[in-house]
Amino acid sequence: MLRCVIPSVRATATTRTFVRFASSQGYIDGIAALKQDLKKAMLAKDNLRKTTIRGVLSTIKNKEIDSKDKDLDEFVLYDVYAKLISQRKDSIAEFVKNKREDLVEKEANEIKILENYQTALPVASREEVDARVVQILTDLKESEPSIQLKQVFGKIDWKTLPGELKASPAAIRSSISSQFKKVFQ
């Protein structure tokens, strides 16, 4: 009788995090938190949190593929969360119109989950960005009282301002557009 002995292989469990080389630390930490929470949700069998996080990770992966030559940072994550929250709010409006209260509740819970991740990012809040933009616009108004909105965008140093404000360029542009009329009237 022949006996085959298979040597036992001792495997060690290691976790690997694959992120883009040029990503900021805030971005890396945000992705790591999402993946860790996904594992926890799977173990807890929390389907709502699990599907929400999977959707977020999928959206982020698509964003990485679309912007393969650009640096990714926490501002990209903030914009992704803002977009997903906006989509959920639009869905809630449609579901209320069609009297689908079960789906309204599901979308509202997803918004809470997304907002928790959005507030955890080291990014300035909308109010903080608006306050700083108003200050910048009033300084511009003092030096050039008849400046146009297009010219304001040209006067801003887009390489340093997002870092100073801890906000994405898209959030800053949106804030400038909304605050311009208030300051220049």
UniProtKB/Swiss-Prot annotation:
Keywords: Mitochondrion, Transit peptide. It comes from the Eukaryota. It is found in: Mitochondrion. The keyword Transit peptide applies. GO terms for molecular function: carbon-nitrogen ligase activity, with glutamine as amido-N-donor. SUPFAM superfamilies: GatB/YqeY motif (SSF89095). GO terms for cellular component: mitochondrion. InterPro entries: Asn/Gln_tRNA_amidoTrase-B-like (IPR003789), YqeY/Aim41 (IPR019004), YqeY/Aim41_N (IPR042184). Residues 1-21 form a transit peptide. Pfam families: YqeY. Belongs to the AIM41 family. This is Altered inheritance of mitochondria protein 41, mitochondrial. It comes from Kluyveromyces lactis (strain ATCC 8585 / CBS 2359 / DSM 70799 / NBRC 1267 / NRRL Y-1140 / WM37).
